[in-house]
Structure formats: structure tokens, C-alpha cells
Amino acid sequence: MKFSHKKVYYLEIKCYLCPKIIEIYQLFMKKKLTLAILAFLSSSMMTAQVEDKKTEGEGDKDESAFTFTESQLGEDDDMSQNVTIVNSNSNIYANEVGYLWSPVRFRYRAFNQKYNDVYINGALMNDAESGQFRYSQVGGLNNQTRSGEYSLPFEANNFAMPSMGGTNNYNFRPSAMPIGNKAALSVANRNYTLRGMYSYSSGLNEKGWAVAAALTYRWADRGYVEGTFYNSLSYFLGIEKQTGNHSISFVTWGNPTERASQGASTDEMYWIANNRYYNPYWGYQNGKKRNSRVINDFAPTALLTWDWKINDDMKLTTSLTGKYSMYKSTKLNYNNSDNPHPDYWKVLPSSYYNVWNEDDNSYRTESAWDAWNNAYNWLSSSKANRQIDFDRLYAANVGASQQGADAMYYIQAKHNNQLDIKLSSTLDMKLDDKQKLVMGMNLGTTKGMHYQTMDDMLGATQFHNINYYALGKYDINSEQVQYDLNNPNAKVGEGDRFGYDYNILVDRADFWTTYSATLSRMHAFVSGRVSGTQMQRDGKMRNGLAKDNSYGKSGTARFLDGGGKIGLSFNLGKGNIIQLGAGYELRTPTASTAFASPEINNDFVANLKNEKVFSAEFGYSLSKSWMRANVNAYYSRIKDATEWQCFYFDDANSFSYVSLTGVEKEYYGVEYGLKFKITSAFSIQAIGTVSEAKYANDANVRYMLSTSGDYGDDICHLKGVREASTPLLAQSLTLSYNNKGWFIDLTGNYYDRMYLSPSVYHRYDQICEHDNDGNAIVPDQWEGNGGFMLDASIGKLIRLKKGQLSINLTLTNILNNRDICTGGYEQSRSDLTASGNSRGYLFSMNPKKFYAYGTNGMLNFTYRF
């Protein structure tokens, strides 16, 4: 199970699939093929030219739809970003769910986003540490992300072994962009309120040159949620030269963005504020609104692609990618003072009076009721009382500074920067009219830089790099309270690093191949891959809780993984097709889950091993001139998965680093899509899924508190707990009209079975109560409200003497249903005090939630010329 980059591995693949492959082997010494193989081996990856299969009308219609999807992805650091995007030209269901169900953050089959691979020009763009692709990286690049090739879990493609959650390959070559100029202006009441776009593509001229450029600006002084703002500039620039059978393209793009976040809160606080979109992250400073959670995100990327058409049956594509991403997220914190957050549990009415238990004699008294009313009256009397009081924080810090004390309140910034370089190559060979062989390689090296800085001292004059959380256990003069023993008691100013500073280093090599063939009425493919990964931590501070195991490089974890897939489709005639697929693979644990407490020490998670993933699928599709239909049933099971999380454990005034190992999960369900024409202008479409996604066992858990540095082990009772923040049941019915340049859609959506992220703490065996037989009594998982949502869009395409103008209006949640819960999490704090007494406030009854936006829309004007 080890892989070393210091050794060279040769992989010999003997293939007896068909006589044509033997002929290719015999031709190996011929010049062109020899050059192709040498270039393939030396470059290392694969990709394929792709086509934009959307028609002009569909492009006009999708403009607002795509923008809506984009606005829902990764727009809040505290909401789940596990959003998967799938598409398919052959599957009605997969073709629609990407944007249609984005208001509730739908994830394809409830999979984690790391199972959804995204490529650009054949180069893998998923983050090497988390395994996920962040769609904000291509935010605003609407034209560029239109052109692409998509494959479902058991559909062969030209750029990779298909992933369990679908695989996308966007074509960013300038010659693939729609020729001409395009200008667009949009107004909305979503995360941003104004958007301007301009794009240009020359197409290939007589000398073989193509140039493409795009610029997008998105802005909101206030987004849909109060206290948020949005400021983003997207750019794209590409040039391509084709000469003979060769094409070289260079493109660069980026999306520098600054945006303010929305925080989850409890239903009690939403009720007091009379607002489902109450946001605890902002407050007033000198009478002006200020958000404490501001995200700055910029990932400039450059991509060099060489395409070589060796002959009519063979093509080589090679890409070199470089990306430097800069991600900063701020947060209000406090030191030796009261919690400044406006929805802190101690200021809520239910902390004084137990609203859940009528038999509670301690917290159901007359004085407790008076305290409840006083708290309610205070919070409900003024909006300012429900928000952060920055003026008070400044005053407290000024007073502390006058006494020579450290800042009591401050804004810290967490940085997650990354340098990523990838080299990839693909060789696409048509063996004959019925057989095809594609093979590819990917090499990548990543340096993730993780550290914390002082963003704003809020009027204070000093702060020290000391672990104030540990002061309750250790003396101020002890080594354990030092974040960096190499620089003890270091003074921290604005912009200085403190708390933690470390790098994560990841190297990966991947080899894959896909063979596909058509035999009479059967089409089949076989795909396989083998990969090697190594990872390590490089600490830049010597933490007092792990003075001999935090500074410098850790050991190196090495993994060898791989797997295979097979897919079959049978054409039964008259438009009837049956599909079958099965796959098994080993997957290396991601670097983001591999380290037990990366902010403190170099330790890897105990018992770290490859995931084992099995998946299977059965599908049926029917295609007629007036109707298309498909239904798919699937089953997937994951074993030996590793999960990691970090949360603030209020009971111990400490951060808790939690690793779950030996995790098993299973996913199964049925998906369907149906679309048929009523007349030439009217059509009806129905799509839906009924699914299950849950833990299949109780996991091993190891945890550490940031105040002690000691590990604890337990069993976490997760069996039966569902995947969170996505509907496991969703249905849609759409009535469409498309005639003489007009298009109108009316869609009814129903969502249900949306669960909140579980608290692992409340499911530790030592925390759970037990019955007389010793079995743990595990709390039920919180489920959010589902509901019905009505959407509509109307548009008109107007052809002008010079170009064409399209106008479209998209409306979401027309009936203003604000009760649909899109996600949230259970709080990880006990209902008992440290001494074992009951609290009036029950954390187990007060999860924090997000709700779907009420009525919102976008009006879009697009001019092409």
C-alpha cells in the first residue's frame, strides 16, 4: 500500500480484446505511432475535444438558469458546499437536476462532491486536499462552461474513468467558443443584484489563430440576506494556434471575489426576529452595517493545451495546468470576555425558562418566566439588539488597552491558500468502426498553505500568540499555552500569523484506460485506473501541546489505489434500451481528512486506509419522436471511509478535532425522467428521485481537545443516520411552451426528507444513555421541513438586422414558501452542566438551520452580434 515518487514504475498492460490491438502493437516501430507514445508517456494526461451540443434556442433559455445555479454554489462558507453538478444529453433526469433543484442544494444521489470529477481540457480540477471541485473557481464564466462533455457513472467518456458521482469535462479552447460578441445585463434579488457580462470570440481565422475573451462583474450592496454583500470580477483570456495537425492553446482565468456570509441560527431566533433569513454575522459600527464573516477568494489559473491529430484514427491531447488559490475567511472571536455573538444561547429567552419540559421545577418558575419575557422584549424591541454591537466591542478593547491587557475581541482570518501544478495527457485511438481505446495519465503536485492571521484588533493595541483556551488547565508560564515555542509570547499585530501555521503537501500519479465496443445491438465499455498518492504535513510553529511533533515535516503516508468499471447497453429495438453497470475501486483518503489535528501536530489519523467503493446500476430508456423516458435504479456502498471535523466545544471552552474511521455508507434509490410533446409548441416533463443515503455502521471515533492535546477514543453510534443538507425525495413537473421565439416554463417542485448534519458528540457511546441490556439509546436525527416550490421562466428571442436580442425572466419560489429547510446542523453541546445538572436551555432541541429563499428572480438581457 505504499507509493514512492523516488521510484519509477512501469506498467505493462496485455490486452487481447481484439486483433486490431495486435495490429497496433505491430505498428509500434512506425514513426508516427512511436512519437505519439513517447509524447504520451513524457507528458502525462489525457483529454478529448468536446462539442457544445446545445442548440441556439436552448442557450438563450439556459442563460438565467445557469446564473441561478451559479449563485447557489459555494456562496456561503457555513452552508454545505457539497453540491454536485451532473449533466447528460441522453438522460432527462440528469440533464435537469443540476439547476432545477439548486434552490435546495441538491446533491446527485446525495454523494459527497469529491465523487464528482471536473476536468477542463482534460485536466482534473478537483482540489488535491479535499477532493472536491469548487465551482466558484469558474464563477461568472457562463460561455466557457457551456461547452463540455458529461458522463454519468456508467457512461464511457474520452477523458477519464467515469466517477461515481458523474464526470464533467469543460472545453476552454478559444476555437470552441461561440463566434462573435455577446453582451448581457442582469438584475436580480439574489446573492447579487446586478451583473454585467461581455465576451468575444474570433473563431479560427485563415491563418489558424483564434482569440477569446470574457469579463463579468457581479455586485450587491446588499444580497437577499441582510448584512451580506457581493463583489466579484471574473475574467477569461485565451489564444489558440492551429497549424497542420497540431493545435496549441493557452488560456487563463480567475474570479476574484469578496462576499459577506450568512450564518445559521435556531428557530427560536428566527421567530423572535420574525425573519427566516435572520443573520447573526453582522452588526452596527458607528451606525453602519458590518459583517464579521467576510470571504476573499481568488484562484488565478493558467492552462496550456497541445492537441495533436496524429491521423484520422488517433489523437493526443496534453495539458499543463498551474493554479494559485488564495482563500481567506474572517471570524469574530473573543478572549477572556463574554461571548459577543448576538444569538449566543445565554441571551435567548429559552435559556431562562424551559419551554420543552412542563415538569421542570427548576426552570418553570415565576421568576424564570419573568426572565423569559425580559429577554424576549429586549431582543424583539430593536433590530440592533439582535445584531453584533461593534461599538461595545471597541469600547471594551480600548479599556483593556489602557490597563495593558490583550484584546478582548478581535477579527481573525483563516487562510487556505494552495499552489497546484498538474500535467496530463490522453491518447484517443479508434481501433475500427466499432472499437475504441483511450488511455491517459495525470501527474500532480500540491502545496496547501494553512494559517491564521489577525485581521482587525477592533481598537486594541496588543495581543499575544498564546493558547488562551488552555489557560484553564495550564499555568500562563507553562510551555503548553504557547502556540509557537520557537517564538514564545510573540506579540501579534494586524496581518501577523498566530494560532497555527502549516503546509499540506500532496503528490499524485494516475493512470487509466477505457476500451469500448459496439457489437450488433450491444455497446460495452471496460474502464480501469491505478493511482499512487503521498501526503505529509509541514509545520511552521512548534505548538506547546505537541512540542516534539508539530514543527517541521511529518512522516509520509503513501497509498496505492485503483479500480475498474464495466458498462453494458442493449438496444432492444423501437427505441428501447437497457443499461447495466458495475464497478469497484479503492480510493485514497483525502489529505483534508488524513491528519488527526493538523492545527496542533503532525499526527495522521489512526488506522488510515483506502476507501472501498462498490457501485451498480440498472437503467431503462425509451425514445420516440414524441416522447423520451428513462428510469434508473442504483446501489452504492462505501467501506473504510475516513471523515474529519473540527467544532467549538463550548462545554470545555475548546476546539474539538474529531476523526471517524471505519465508516460504512450505503446509497440506493430510483430516478426517473419523462418528457413528451403535447403539440409542436407544448410539452410536459416530469423528473423525480426516491432515494436513501445513510451510515451503515457505527464508526470508530478519536477526538482531541485543543486545551489538552490528549486523545480520547470511543464508538460513535451513526448507523442509520442520513446524509444531510440535500433532499432524499424530490419531484418536479414542468409545462413548457416554445413557439416563434417565445418560451415559457412553469415548474412545480416538491422536496422532502432533508436532514440536518448530525452531532457526533451526542452519539458518542459514553455520552448516550443505555437501556437495561447495555444498548445505547441514540438520539434521532433532526429532519428539516420539506415542501412545495413553484418556479417559472419566460423569454423572448428577437432577431435584429445586426445580431439578436434575448430577454428572459426567471422567478423562483413564486408562492414564497419560506418554510423549506435547506440544511443546518445539530449543536454539539450537552443539555447537562459540567457538574451533571440539567440546563434550562436544551441544545438537543435547538439545531441551527438554513431556509430556502422566498420569492426571488432575475431579469436578463442578452445581445449577440
Description of each model-found segment:
Residues Q49, K639-D640, I684, Y750-E769, ...:
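C-terminal beta-signal and adjacent terminal beta-strands/loops
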Residues D127-A128, G139-A184, R195:
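A beta-strand signature from Gram-negative outer-membrane beta-barrel systems
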Residues E258-A260, A264-S265, M269, Q480-K491, ...:
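Surface-exposed extracellular loop regions of Gram-negative outer-membrane beta-barrel proteins
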